[in-house]
């Protein structure tokens, strides 16, 4: 039995969100194929994600200097512990599905806040004399990114979404990365439904081997 972490970042309800609806199609097919797997849901707009702020940086600095968590200020303890909770949940998963829209050639700010909360030195990567090394490598972990945007940006230099997520997953050691991208729905609204159905087919296929 595998543990799937299903992370969404979208303000729109399922009924009108293209990325969420494609993600939902993936999830239904995935659970048909893997009925015994655990699925843990994280909604980055609903579930509070601790951002890196002055208290977090101060707390990390004290910990690196040899202090214990108990000696930090109340705010430092609370916020650092919350970051660790996010990272530990991420580490506990075997598979990851991220469902996102494109905002201004990248991601919503909440998504970057989440990545910052799980890409943590000593948790998901470490430093060595030869450079940073992902601590999640060679463990059979998989990542699927379901992403939508209104134009045609995928595969171009201007796309700071899919390539970034693939890179940061690899940085932590998760190298089995696949994406399902729905794009062009605003640029060519007459073909929006056709584009969506093509993405749904890709999502179903991904679910069958994920």
UniProtKB/Swiss-Prot annotation:
Catalytic activity annotation: 2 a quinone + NADH + H(+) = 2 a 1,4-benzosemiquinone + NAD(+); N,N-dimethyl-1,4-phenylenediamine + anthranilate + 2 NAD(+) = 2-(4-dimethylaminophenyl)diazenylbenzoate + 2 NADH + 2 H(+)
Full protein name: FMN-dependent NADH:quinone oxidoreductase
InterPro entries per UniProt: Flavodoxin_fold, Flavoprotein-like_sf, FMN-dep_NADH:Q_OxRdtase_AzoR1, NADH:quinone_OxRdtase_FMN_depd
Taxonomy, superkingdom: Bacteria
GO molecular function: electron transfer activity; FMN binding; oxidoreductase activity, acting on NAD(P)H as acceptor; oxidoreductase activity, acting on NAD(P)H, quinone or similar compound as acceptor
Top-level enzyme category: oxidoreductase
Coiled-coil region: none
Role, per record: Quinone reductase that provides resistance to thiol-specific stress caused by electrophilic quinones.
Matching HAMAP family: Azoreductase_type1
EC number of the protein: 1.6.5.-, 1.7.1.17
Pfam families: Flavodoxin_2
Keywords annotated in UniProt: Flavoprotein, FMN, NAD, Oxidoreductase
Cofactor: record remark: Binds 1 FMN per subunit.
